[in-house]
Curated annotation (Swiss-Prot):
Location of this chain's protein in the cell: Cytoplasm
Name assigned to this protein: 7-methyl-GTP pyrophosphatase
NCBIfam families given in the database record: maf
Gene Ontology MF annotations: nucleoside triphosphate diphosphatase activity
Active-site residues (renumbered): 73 (proton acceptor)
Organism from which the protein derives: Alcanivorax borkumensis (strain ATCC 700651 / DSM 11573 / NCIMB 13689 / SK2)
EC number, UniProt record: 3.6.1.-
Stored Pfam families: Maf
Feature type site, description Important for substrate specificity: 16, 74, 158
Keywords: Cytoplasm, Hydrolase, Nucleotide metabolism
Length: 197
């Protein structure tokens, strides 16, 4: 980035999102925002992830003038049930048991906030996963091996989690990991950021 180009900041503590953003070969910094991620009453999953992505970016805006802040949030949805990060083994096993044999939608909210202009671009990018029918012992083994306790839906698609799936459907496979790079590059281009290619 040049001196005239705003700093790029990833508003996340996720190592997975940092690894994804590294793919773009852009210099960036990262910082974890401190926000309440509770779902509002009657808030749709789409509205939830878009709001949280924007709030994550806004939470760091005052500290970072002339910065492009990337906020992102993801939930898994089975029917009307929203699944977040399990946090513990038992919840991960319950989430994967609920997903067994079903189609699960992963909704990723993405926000790019320009703190110099106040302009924000916000979107929800869906990605769908058809899970294989899984036996309880398979689920327990997977959770014990991969420890997906900080991942929405209780799996890591970039690792052993891929064996849990029958089919994938979506615009950008990076969305499943938590950062839709195709849309992000469009947002960055709209802000005048020159990508390496």
């Amino acid at each position: 980035m040049t001196d005239q180009t705003p700093t790029l900041l990833l508003a996340s503590s996720s190592p997975f999102r940092r690894q994804l953003l590294d793919k773009l070969k852009l210099d960036f910094i990262h910082q974890s925002p401190d926000i309440d991620e509770s779902r509002h009453e009657d808030e749709s999953p789409t509205a939830l992830v878009m709001r949280l992505a924007r709030e994550k970016a806004l939470a760091l805006a005052d500290q970072h003038p002339n910065t492009l802040i990337i906020g992102s949030d993801q939930v898994a949805v089975i029917g009307n049930q929203v699944l977040g990060k399990p946090g513990d083994r038992d919840t991960a096993i319950r989430q994967l048991s609920a997903a067994s044999g079903k189609r699960v939608s992963f909704l990723t909210g993405l926000c790019l906030l320009n703190t110099a202009t106040g302009r924000s671009q916000v979107v929800c990018d869906p990605f769908h996963v058809q899970f294989r029918t899984l036996k309880p012992a398979q689920i327990e083994r997977y959770v014990d091996i991969e420890q997906p306790l900080n991942c929405a839906g209780s799996f890591k698609s970039e690792g052993l989690g891929i064996v849990l799936f029958k089919a994938l459907e979506g615009r950008d496979p990076n969305t499943l990991v938590g950062l839709p790079l195709i849309i992000l590059t469009e947002f960055l281009a709209a802000e005048g950021v020159q990508l390496p290619l």
